[in-house]
């Protein structure tokens, strides 16, 4: 094969592999088997090995780097990666909206809601459409350059896709008709969408050819991968990861990108910045998808707070069946101008809030232990605790099952404990916090 023939073949293979990456990670469609896709990658790899001068930084073969890095470089974010305030009830959510309306009464207050992922926030900077820098959030202003590790995540595009003007027109039309679906405005909206799409498309092409686009999102580990990883940790007599966020963070901060690649992380985008002519958060989400960036399909436009609360309840009910962990939803003021006018308080934008699910764990103090006699005469110890609100209910009692469980926990009367009440199961003491002991605690003894 001549170099020119190899060049054409390599181009076609890259396009084919990138197409299937886009269809799988963005549209959740697997059009060919993983084995067939691996075969295409292997063919591309062999060609590039034979013609190394044709290797490009955005080739699918370049996701995994070579030698481990000695250390991570620091990266200053173009704009701070801020945090969010939390609310835990519809009443608190209403209070948040009231404060914002008081601050900016002329604002447009509709909302875009998405899942609050339990992962690691990262920034992806694309220059001329090519992934240039991937960084952790760090302290919000300065993060760490983990570009090589983020490249190993298949869901993250190495080069952004170029959307058509029609695709952009459809996005703008769809976002406008969700706000005002009345037939009387359809003609005006269509004309507006077409005019707007032309401007946005021109700006996107310019940014992809000679500009800068930043995608922010969440690198996360699925439930299945997390469980598999901890099984492997135990086999190697290494400490298991405490939670999926720690696992994702630990995987991203590996100096050897081969280790990161083996952890099988995933990614969802949630924010887009650049001079693109967009007007709403909803449009930004839709455009990310057109650019080849996966977004969480469980994201919804909400006309008012009632719709937000309904979305919150829907996700709460289905959370156990989701392939990832979540502890709430994120509510964003949809209109970009309103969002910007609301500004920032402390380290959190006023236009975004985390609407958390009822906590499934809480701390409380064991006041006494009572022993109940069952029908078969078996004694069951029951902890009487200070009332605590957990998983949507107030809990005062928790079974301790037997003395073996008390001994395993190292529990004493007066101890501060972590109480868990997940789903519909009965409350359970899962951990004692011995460092909070005062010396007044008492040993638990069964009745003689």
What do these predicted ranges mean?
Residues 169-174, 181-186, 190:
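N-terminal basic, low-structured, amphipathic or hydrophobic segments
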Residues 180-181, 196:
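Compositionally biased non-globular segments, especially hydrophobic aliphatic-rich helices
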Residues 1-172, 192-448:
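RNA/tRNA-interacting regions in translation and RNA-turnover enzymes
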